[in-house]
């Protein structure tokens, strides 16, 4: 019987509202804690710190500064 290999569970930090990415505060491989800012999002002429609601390691960055995003889009992926 072949060995079963568990794939790491991945979790996306999503945009809570539509806006434009101002800055990405993390890079792939960074270890973050719950509450750490991952992205700054400009929405309705206000800059919003988008934080992670769990700890993990950054697996992927899904956005870049200047990019417009819709509510619910993955900003970063944690593993």
Label the model's feature ranges:
Residues 5-79:
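Structured functional modules or segments
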Residues 1-3:
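Flexible, non-catalytic peripheral segments of proteins
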């Amino acid at each position: 019987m072949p060995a079963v290999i568990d794939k790491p569970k991945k979790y996306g930090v999503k945009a809570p509202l539509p806006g434009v990415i101002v800055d990405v505060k993390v890079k792939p491989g960074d270890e973050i804690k719950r509450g750490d800012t991952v992205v700054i999002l400009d929405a309705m002429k206000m800059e919003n710190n988008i934080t992670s609601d769990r700890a993990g390691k950054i697996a992927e960055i899904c956005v870049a500064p200047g990019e417009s995003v819709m509510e619910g889009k993955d900003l970063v992926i944690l593993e």
